[in-house]
Amino acid sequence: MCYNALMNKQEIYNYLKEQNIWHEVTEHKAVFTMEELAEVDIPYPEADAKNLFVCDDKKRNYYLITEKGDKRVDLKEFRKKNNTRPLRFASENDLMDILGLIPGAVTPLGILNDEERKVQVFLESEFLEGRKLIGVHPNENTATVWLKTEDLINIIKEHGNPVQVLEL
């Protein structure tokens, strides 16, 4: 894979602008955990997302699970509900090779780097309630981009990756 082709933060901003997608950006220090992000002054804390990049035990299927920042996903329960093989966190190498991301910067916008459309996205349905906003990293963990949840779903679908909205 040619890493020069991967979209970085500025390229994500340019893409959103070119697609006429409303977004708001909050620049902040690099954050690697939800606890660190809690120390940052963000405008829509209720819309902040936590992302888990997982694969099955055979590394045949990859999933990006996007949930509310204050929630926890039980991977065993998730597996049962979605009829997957046993799940585990994907390796740092897989994260870089497939999504072009480093740990701490996992985001649904990384799907734009998934050239083979390997990753299936699962999105928490609560992001479609209230303001219907979602806050995700722009492929780097030094900012949060706030988008309309429907726009994010459309970005993923238009790229060719499957996305399911469900209660996690």
Language model features with spans:
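Extended, low-hydrophobicity, polar/charged segments
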Residues: 2-168
